[in-house]
């Protein structure tokens, strides 16, 4: 029956009528769909470039059908609201409205595809939350949302039930009942006041809907009722710029199709369902792309395969099917052909007939033609399906071709992101060094170990100009041809938008002594440039990673509206100082941009306007951008990091590190060979090998303490906890919704707070509130990854009112402050709740610490954060009573020497690691500390270790800190004291020999382990000691 058709079937059946409607004004419906987030910015740009109205309309319908039934339903409603006459033409309004209960509506705060609480095309209130203040004797006015105040009390209207553990005062109950008619209707409303045990009712004329408001109510089912309860807040501290009061706990109104739901747990459940549904859709798209490319992730491509393929096909071979694209890319990259990526698109010249056939295939959803695959999708699929050895070769050759390299590779199949550290290990940078009084010599250094500032470029919302094209112009010499370091949207052929490569973070390095930079010496010292693909609102993890490691972040967007303000309310003052905004020329005269600059106190160089005109305008644009970059590079607050340094932070954020997986595979292979010792035909030989192996392991505590623990833990690691922490399990806490409350976030880089990044499980710019989502975390879920949209939760007005409070909290923070040894002082308070406390508790900690740090930095610092190498040495202490070790390969090998076999690294192994590895044999810890921890979460384990005073005393003897001026002797004592508690005899034989070299890596970890008597520590001594250690460590990397 026609009345039972799905929305996609309706579109298919009425395609001709819909095309006639769309042809009149396709741009209007296109703009509306984009504003409702039903189509992405890339899809909008692709359709915008199509000049033929009929083709544009046909492609739009196809795109909507591809996105599923929910999108089709919202598209039809959006179409009827934009073109009211379309409903009469098609006669479909009744049929469309019938599907409202079958297609889940995108409710406020729960949908990642729409920022509206109702259907598209409806005029919304100013914010997703309906906020009304009124005095005891005044009427409720929902139409104007006027603010009234009583001398003693103010009220807040919400649709969610009040928190059970909070007190309620004078809770009015407002019941709104209304009916929906075809043309217009009146909406009687009864306000029921419950006060002091008495009930009385008043009619409120202001609740009658106007004409525009009626259009917004047609999507609500008939006879629906919304019960609104209120909580009372009285917080004089939250005073905004406009002089109105703001409140810490803001809640939202949610309308369901049948019965209203007010439980925060149910809302969280719907968020989980949306998240899982989105993940499943991405997995399906990923599998489709791999199928199109004829690739299988379970069958890794090896370098020998590429060589054999090249020999069989020859140098003049051209791809003939989509399955040849990946091989074409690999062949040309291995040959260091700079057209490797271009060949993916320009392998075949299309004539007019071929173009028509291609368009017809797209319209029939046959989109797997070779021209339609985005080259970045091919790159990501190729890297994910390649063996680690091939990945290293591809990375090295891409670097030689001056291509941007994938730093964070999106893994859509597993909903993760991978730091490609191991794949970059073989990249070598040749440098010319001139010794005093001697000739110039060329030296080689691994690129992953070179420390330099990082500048990131991200897109916020819609941007009409190409960010990657601007970067190519910036990095290419003026008199030479523009080199495509980054692929951009101006591609020569018709391609689909990115399918699996959104969230990709690419990186390129600029060296002033390079041959291609000598003619355009813009950067006077080495710098790394990172580029995030896609809208940062959809990739919160990657954006947080870049905020941590970058010395400056450039935001590209057309204009600054509520959505942009909502995001920036999560940025602290020190983070804002590192942010630069590139806007379109239309935003120059806008009032929003002026308010934005005034409120955030942006310097002129932080707000750039990109003119789209002749060559003169383009030259002025580049000059302005270069001036901003010069300001960054000459800043005294530059933070220099290496790719190796980024690994610790990546693990904390739930980002996988590829070399961890490689080490685990290596362990499994070697362990499998040893454990299959009784195989037929090799039984005796295997048995003797295993026996000699166990004998050598028994002797290793005396001869090679570092190697023994490594081998013993390798076998246990095979059956222990997985190496990779899932993103949705024990992940750092994103802003989540709990009972209508949303956690406020302050994006603050870790060094702003006075210590290196990579300290804790949660990000350093995350500032949780007391009402943390314990339930969601208990279920191991997090909704921030690729789904968190701040604009859903906060309006621009809330940002204005919140800004002063948030920025006030960071007023003492200074970007680029040198690390301070706060962790030595915080350990005087060994007990600390699992979740971070309130701001008042943070102030209490601040008073104990005695440093002028911002409030946002206190919760993070209060953990007593281990420094990077300290975290490596401390993490193996946490063992269960059964002897099951929690260890990953990256913890035992945090330095470049870790590439070598264990037996060959005894002399190079830092002494601090040797002590820890011996410590794991005899030092037992509380098994309860294992709860909620993960092997990738170094800081989480360290934090748990601090919470037990006995553990602190057990792990660190008093003589350790009493002689800070003798690091070697104190370190020797630390190494000896740990195993002596259970195995005194091995301890005597493991004393370091005087002739054994002491690598500089071991020294920075000396003052970092927790001290039982840290309150008596002299801060100046500790600070000087840290500075000295930090300098020595910096020379190593």
From Swiss-Prot:
Protein origin, superkingdom:
Eukaryota
Q: What InterPro entries does UniProt report for this protein, alphabetically?
A: Apoptosis_Repressor_CARD, CARD, DEATH-like_dom_sf
Per the record, which residues fall in region Disordered? 235-270, 669-704, 887-1037
Residue numbers bearing the Phosphoserine modification: 154, 985
Q: Which Gene3D superfamilies match?
A: Death Domain, Fas
Give all N-acetylalanine modified positions: 2
Q: Where is the composition biased (Low complexity)?
A: 690-699
**Domain CARD span(s) in chain numbering:** 3-94
**Which residue ranges have biased composition labelled Basic residues?**
1023-1037
- Which processes are annotated in GO (biological process)? apoptotic process; regulation of apoptotic process
Indicate whether DNA damage appears among the record's keywords.
no
Q: Where is the signal peptide?
A: none
Q: Where is the composition biased (Polar residues)?
A: 911-928, 938-954, 963-984
Q: Residue spans with biased composition (Pro residues)?
A: 994-1012
Compositional bias per record (Acidic residues), positions renumbered to this chain: 242-261
Please explain the role this protein plays, according to its UniProt record: May be involved in apoptosis.
Provide the protein name: Caspase recruitment domain-containing protein 6
Q: Give the originating organism.
A: Homo sapiens
């Amino acid at each position: 029956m026609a009345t039972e058709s799905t929305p996609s079937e309706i579109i298919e059946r009425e395609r001709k009528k819909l095309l006639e409607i769309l042809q009149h004004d396709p741009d209007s419906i296109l703009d509306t769909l984009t504003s409702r987030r039903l189509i992405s910015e890339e899809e909008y740009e692709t359709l915008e470039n199509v000049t033929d109205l009929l083709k544009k309309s046909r492609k739009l319908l196809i795109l909507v059908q591809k996105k599923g039934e929910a999108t089709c339903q919202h598209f039809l409603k959006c179409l009827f609201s934009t073109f009211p006459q379309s409903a009469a033409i098609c006669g479909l309004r009744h049929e469309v409205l019938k599907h409202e209960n079958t297609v889940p509506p995108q409710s406020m705060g729960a949908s990642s595809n729409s920022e509206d609480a109702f259907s598209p095309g409806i005029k919304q209130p100013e914010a997703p939350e309906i906020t009304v203040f009124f005095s005891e004797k005044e009427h409720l006015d929902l139409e104007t949302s006027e603010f009234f105040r009583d001398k003693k009390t103010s009220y807040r209207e919400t649709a969610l039930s009040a928190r059970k553990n909070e007190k309620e005062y004078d809770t009015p109950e407002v019941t709104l009942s209304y009916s929906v008619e075809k043309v217009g209707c009146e909406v009687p409303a009864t306000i029921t006041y419950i006060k002091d045990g008495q009930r009385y009712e008043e009619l409120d004329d202001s609740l009658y809907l106007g004409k525009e408001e009626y259009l917004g109510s047609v999507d609500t089912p008939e006879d629906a009722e919304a019960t609104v309860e209120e909580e009372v807040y009285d917080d004089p501290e939250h005073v905004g710029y406009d002089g109105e009061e703001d409140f810490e706990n803001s809640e939202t109104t949610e309308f369901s199709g049948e019965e209203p739901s007010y439980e925060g747990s149910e809302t969280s459940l719907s968020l989980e369902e949306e998240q899982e549904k989105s993940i499943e859709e991405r997995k399906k798209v990923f599998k489709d792309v791999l199928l199109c490319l004829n690739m299988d992730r379970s069958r890794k491509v090896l370098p020998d395969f590429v060589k054999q393929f090249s020999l069989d096909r020859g140098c003049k071979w051209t791809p003939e099917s989509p399955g040849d694209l990946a091989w074409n890319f690999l062949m040309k990259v291995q040959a260091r052909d700079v057209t490797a990526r271009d060949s993916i698109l320009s392998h075949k010249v299309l004539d007019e007939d071929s173009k028509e056939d291609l368009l017809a295939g797209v319209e029939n959803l046959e989109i797997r033609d070779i021209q339609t695959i985005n080259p970045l999708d091919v790159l990501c699929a190729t890297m994910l399906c390649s063996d680690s050895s091939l990945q290293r070769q591809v990375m090295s050759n891409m670097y030689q071709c001056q291509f941007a390299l994938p730093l964070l590779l999106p893994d859509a199949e597993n909903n993760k992101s991978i730091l490609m550290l191991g794949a970059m290990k073989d990249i070598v940078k040749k440098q010319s060094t001139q010794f005093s009084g001697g000739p110039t010599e060329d030296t080689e250094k691994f690129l992953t170990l070179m420390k330099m500032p990082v500048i990131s470029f991200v897109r916020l919302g819609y941007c009409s100009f190409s960010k990657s094209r601007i970067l190519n112009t910036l990095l290419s010499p003026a008199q030479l041809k523009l080199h495509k370091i980054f692929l951009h949207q101006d591609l020569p052929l018709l391609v689909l938008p990115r399918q699996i490569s959104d969230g990709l973070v690419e990186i390129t390095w600029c060296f002033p002594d390079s041959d291609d930079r000598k003619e355009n010496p813009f950067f006077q010292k080495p710098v790394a440039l990172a580029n995030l693909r896609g809208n940062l609102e959809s990739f919160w993890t990657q954006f947080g990673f870049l905020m941590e490691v970058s010395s400056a972040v450039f935001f590209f967007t057309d204009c600054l509206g509520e959505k942009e303000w909502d995001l920036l309310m999560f940025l602290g003052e020190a983070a804002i100082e590192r942010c630069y905004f590139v806007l379109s020329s239309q935003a120059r005269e806008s009032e929003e941009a002026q308010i934005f600059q005034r409120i955030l106190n942006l310097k002129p160089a932080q707000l750039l306007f990109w003119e789209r005109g002749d060559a003169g305008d383009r030259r002025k644009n580049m000059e302005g951008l270069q001036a901003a970059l010069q300001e960054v590079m000459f800043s005294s607050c530059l933070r220099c990091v290496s790719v190796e340094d980024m690994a610790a932070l990546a693990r904390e954020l739930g980002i996988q590190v590829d070399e961890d997986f490689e080490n685990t595979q290596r362990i499994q292979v070697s362990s499998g060979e040893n454990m299959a010792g009784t195989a037929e035909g090799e039984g005796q030989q295997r048995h003797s090998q295993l026996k000699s192996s166990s004998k050598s392991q028994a002797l290793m505590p005396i001869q090679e303490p570092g190697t023994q623990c490594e081998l013993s833990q390798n076998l246990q690691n095979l059956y222990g906890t997985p190496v990779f922490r899932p993103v949705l399990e024990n992940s750092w806490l994103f802003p989540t919704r709990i009972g209508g409350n949303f956690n406020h976030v302050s994006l603050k880089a870790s060094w702003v707070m006075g210590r290196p990044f990579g300290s804790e499980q949660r990000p350093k710019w995350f500032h949780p509130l007391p009402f943390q989502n314990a339930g969601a975390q208990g279920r191991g879920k997090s909704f921030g990854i690729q789904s968190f949209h701040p604009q859903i939760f906060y309006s621009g007005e809330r940002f204005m009112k919140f800004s002063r409070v948030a920025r006030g909290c960071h007023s003492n923070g200074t970007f680029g402050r040198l690390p301070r040894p706060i962790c030595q002082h915080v350990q005087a308070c060994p007990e600390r709740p699992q979740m971070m406390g309130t701001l008042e508790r943070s102030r209490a900690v601040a008073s104990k610490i005695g440093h002028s740090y911002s409030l946002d930095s206190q919760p993070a610092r209060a953990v007593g954060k281990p420094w990077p190498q300290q975290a490596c040495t401390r993490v193996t202490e946490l063992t269960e009573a059964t002897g099951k070790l929690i260890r990953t390969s990256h913890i035992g090998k945090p330095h470049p020497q870790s590439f070598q076999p264990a037996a060959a690294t005894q002399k190079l192994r830092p002494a601090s690691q040797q002590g820890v590895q011996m410590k794991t044999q005899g030092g037992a810890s509380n098994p309860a500390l294992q709860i909620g921890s993960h092997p990738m979460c170094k800081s989480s384990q360290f934090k748990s270790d601090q919470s037990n005073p006995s553990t602190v005393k057990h792990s660190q003897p008093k003589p350790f800190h009493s002689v800070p001026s003798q690091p070697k002797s104190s370190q020797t004592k630390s190494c000896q004291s740990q195993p002596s508690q259970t195995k005194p005899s091995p301890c005597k034989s493991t004393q370091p020999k005087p002739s054994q070299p002491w690598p500089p890596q071991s020294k920075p970890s000396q003052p970092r382990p927790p001290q039982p008597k840290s309150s008596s520590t002299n801060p100046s001594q500790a600070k000087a000691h840290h500075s000295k250690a930090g300098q020595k460590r910096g020379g190593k990397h």
